Amino acid sequence: MERTCTRRWRMKLEIPDVKKLVHEMVMPIRWGDMDAMGHLNNASYMRFMETIRIEWFSAIGCEPNPQGQGPVIVNVFCNFYKQLQYPCNVLMKMYVSDAGRSSFESWATFEPVDQPGVIHAAGGATTIWVDFPAQKSAPLPDWMRALIS
């Protein structure tokens, strides 16, 4: 028996209006970042978001410490609005919001440098603060909470 899908499934997570801009950087699309259709590959969007997140963590002194505490990403998503194609320099903007006991949300937008304000994609991630030796969540440190709030 052949099965057909009669529903249109659509998962789209919204980027909140209330968020705090914490970091910006320009990333060039490299030839190897493209898919067979000449667009920025879906996996590359995740890599771009990872890159700006890690650059921000480094800028605020949040370096990896397996014997202590630090951030762990527990989910990530990206909404695609317009195609990004090579060659292109992409202005990445990173935002944070929603500080909880041990977590916060981060958001990233993608806009071509030559098209200011035209967002081609936007995504986000949930970050949990973890006590690595105990392998469980820990309260956000006050210094991190102050940066997010």
Give each language-model segment a name.
Residues 5, 9-25, 80, 84-86, ...:
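HotDog/MaoC-like acyl-thioester-processing domains
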Residues 5-58:
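Catalytic strand-loop segment that frames the active site of acyl-thioester-processing enzymes
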Residues 18, 42, 69, 74-77, ...:
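Anionic, Ser/Thr-rich low-complexity intrinsically disordered regions
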Residues 31-33, 61, 77-82, 114:
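Short, well-ordered turn and helix-capping elements at secondary-structure junctions
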Residues 45-48, 72, 126:
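Residue-level recognition of specific faces of alpha-helices
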Residues 61-67, 71:
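A short, contiguous structural element within a folded domain that forms the immediate neighborhood
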